[in-house]
Amino acid sequence: MITLITHVINPLAYIVPVLLAVAFLTLLERKVLGYMQLRKGPNIVGPYGLLQPIADGLKLFIKETVRPSTSSPFLFLATPMLALTLALTLWAPMPIPYPVTDLNLGVLFVLALSSLAVYSILGSGWASNSKYALIGELRAVAQTISYEVSLGLILLSVIIITGGFTLQTFNVAQESIWLLVPAWPLAAMWYISTLAETNRAPFDLTEGESELVSGFNVEYAGGPFALFFLAEYANILLMNTLSAVLFLGASHIPAFPELTALNLMTKAALLSVVFLWVRASYPRFRYDQLMHLVWKSFLPLTLALVLWHLALPIALAGLPPQL
């Protein structure tokens, strides 16, 4: 019975809410963009358009999955499944406030799995056997790999400040003050890097509708497309939850774990709304600007900050207290 709970019910209890949150994030996005463009957004299906995501999901999954005759059959269908599997597995070490698996190296696990997501994009672009998909996929891979570097270095700095690799440690470290306050340059670079990592505007070069039709998923329709869509939005929510854990640590009251969960979800939701706000406000970056930003601005800065955070405790450790 215990194994049933830990291996079946526990994972389901966090997969289902994540998928529901993803569904309603799509609705929120359409509503926010609608109001920013002085229109209503979805308002027909259900009260205030609240059932729109359910109608969308149903429509996508009952469509026929069309596969291009020249595509690689196995890879074409395996990559969307891989994308969603990775997006959902990433939630396992998240302290909301108790994780599904409390990993010792939770931060590294998140970093490793999020860089594996590149392979789903790589496979789908190549398996589609289409020029547009290939160009979109090459852009996506270059962008994701480039921003992984800055994300990794920012994480390293934050780990040095916090003193632990488990995501639970961040809650303890931020009991007196949010990490956002002393490490605001890190937080700003982290947030921009997560935008690029999740292929969101203004870094949505992979799916630039004006030039690439739809990017790496141009040949996908129906079910497999829905899986990619779910994976993308699950990643957005995950990155924002991670940002909230790292820089806006939820104060954990052991007697009321529900409050911590509510606290964290509210912060993640607000950060996600800022994602949508950015999408409505900024034009798309040019490819070379995107690469200049990470390699010429973020990389030197993050490297300097890693060295600074390493040197500071070592330099001050030899001094007597209360100088």
Curated annotation (Swiss-Prot):
Main location: mitochondrion
Family designation: Belongs to the complex I subunit 1 family.
Described purpose of this protein according to its UniProt entry: Core subunit of the mitochondrial membrane respiratory chain NADH dehydrogenase (Complex I) that is believed to belong to the minimal assembly required for catalysis. Complex I functions in the transfer of electrons from NADH to the respiratory chain. The immediate electron acceptor for the enzyme is believed to be ubiquinone.
Top-level class of the enzyme under EC nomenclature: translocase
Molecular-function annotations in GO: NADH dehydrogenase (ubiquinone) activity
The protein's name: NADH-ubiquinone oxidoreductase chain 1
Reactions catalysed according to its record: a ubiquinone + NADH + 5 H(+)(in) = a ubiquinol + NAD(+) + 4 H(+)(out)
Membrane-crossing segments per the record: 8-28, 74-94, 105-125, 145-165, 176-196, 236-256, 258-278, 298-318
Organism annotation: Oncorhynchus mykiss (Rainbow trout)
GO annotations of cellular component type: mitochondrial inner membrane
Record key words, sorted: Electron transport, Membrane, Mitochondrion, Mitochondrion inner membrane, NAD, Respiratory chain, Translocase, Transmembrane, Transmembrane helix, Transport, Ubiquinone
HAMAP family, sorted: NDH1_NuoH
Compartments in which it is found: Mitochondrion inner membrane
GO terms, biological process: aerobic respiration
PANTHER family named in the record: NADH DEHYDROGENASE SUBUNIT 1 (PTHR11432), NADH-UBIQUINONE OXIDOREDUCTASE CHAIN 1 (PTHR11432:SF3)
